[in-house]
């Protein structure tokens, strides 16, 4: 091996190292793939669906109601919908969502049992905390059972369902 071969080898190696570093940075800080597990998001997302999670978006803007998010709770990664925002009082009565006493449309659920924020120990949602529910309200472990979710436990926004291929959808 002469000096030119060594230089060429080092150039190629550097290209691969840079490519791997970029891929790792994107995977750690920008996007990830997540499989939906369980029926809690039926019919929006079903068990086995693969989604793309945008990890960067909530560093750039606030979380909004009705966004689908990936979160970590009790060492489990799950997908839920944001229903309640910081400073709000949430109540479900007769299958209708009320935010601060005002009726809000919620067409994603066919059946939601009556629920008040007070039943999980709050009058209003504290700063940097959120109330999340599964779209399949009758079969979901969500804020009604495990409490509010800290902003720091929200991994990112579910942007796209990429599998199954015949049901690709942008959210």
Cite the ranges covered by each PLM segment:
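Short strand-turn-strand beta-turns centered on an Asx-Gly dipeptide
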Residues: 99-101
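Short, surface-exposed secondary-structure edge patches
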Residues: 40-44, 59-62, 81, 87, ...
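Protein maturation boundaries and topogenic segments
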Residues: 1-77, 149-153, 157-171
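Soluble extracytoplasmic domains of inner/organellar membrane proteins
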Residues: 118-171
